[in-house]
């Protein structure tokens, strides 16, 4: 099982996720609370190579053979085969952002940094004055946006280009950054009417929509509760719960959801 600790998805969500990953699709996990959407996204880093080489000092994890940032391109032109290399562990190749109403385009994509321009005595037309947002900094990584409907429509629109073409534009700069990012989005359909929605063109650009679900059997539900309950040995000695009580509690949950 590529997703240890995820129970009840062996014949539904996990095969769908495997197919989406093999197809190099961006993924939307659509489901209610407590259905392991974010946990599955976080466990995807275990499928990555343990280490990858990057150009040392690069803000956006430039591939030494295919640099995209001005910093890495200039450094490789200057030093050639002597370009310093750093090794990035897979645990560092994961970015996550909770969609809230105050998230801006600058947070996600980037903006011009006037302080950097002043310190380096550079014009605002120079590529080196850019301050990269969290998405470019997640180049060659997995980037997760939780609760996508909460993201304002104009912010969702800013993701169109990177999802469709794999590149982005910052503040009208004529630069093309062909980023290598796997996007994973999570959304709760119950929240659509309360707080917002996913704009249709964005939904069209997310190639795989995977529906998560609550456990379908009582046995799976019992296993999940046993796994997730934070009960230490001291508590277990003091409190005894019969198997019948546990089953009744799970059955009540099943009936309530029905």
What are these model-derived regions, one by one?
Residues 1, 195-197, 208-258:
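Conserved C-terminal "switch" segment of AAA+ ATPases
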Residues 1-214:
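Conserved ASCE/P-loop NTPase catalytic core
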């Amino acid at each position: 099982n590529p997703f240890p600790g995820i129970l009840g998805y062996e014949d539904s969500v996990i095969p769908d996720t495997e197919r989406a990953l093999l197809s190099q699709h961006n993924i939307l996990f659509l489901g209610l609370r407590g259905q392991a959407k974010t946990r599955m996204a976080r466990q995807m880093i275990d499928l990555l190579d343990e280490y990858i080489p990057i150009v040392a000092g690069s803000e956006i994890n430039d591939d030494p053979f295919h640099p995209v940032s001005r910093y890495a391109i200039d450094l490789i032109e200057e030093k050639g085969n002597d370009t310093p290399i750093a090794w990035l562990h897979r645990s560092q190749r994961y970015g996550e952002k909770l969609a809230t109403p105050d998230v801006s385009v600058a947070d996600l994509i980037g903006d011009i940094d006037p302080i950097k321009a002043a310190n380096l005595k550079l014009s605002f037309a120079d590529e080196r004055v850019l301050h990269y947002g969290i998405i470019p900094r997640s180049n060659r990584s997995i980037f997760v946006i939780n609760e996508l409907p909460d993201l304002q429509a104009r912010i969702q629109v800013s993701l169109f280009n990177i999802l469709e073409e794999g590149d982005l534009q910052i503040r009208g700069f004529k630069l093309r950054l062909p980023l290598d990012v796997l996007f994973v989005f999570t959304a709760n359909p119950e929240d659509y009417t309360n707080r917002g929605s996913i704009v249709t063109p964005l939904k069209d650009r997310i190639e795989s929509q995977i529906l998560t679900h609550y456990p379908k059997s009582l046995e799976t539900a019992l296993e999940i509760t046993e796994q997730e309950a934070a009960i230490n040995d001291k508590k277990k000695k003091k409190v005894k719960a019969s198997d019948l009580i546990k089953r009744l509690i799970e059955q009540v949950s099943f009936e309530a959801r029905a």
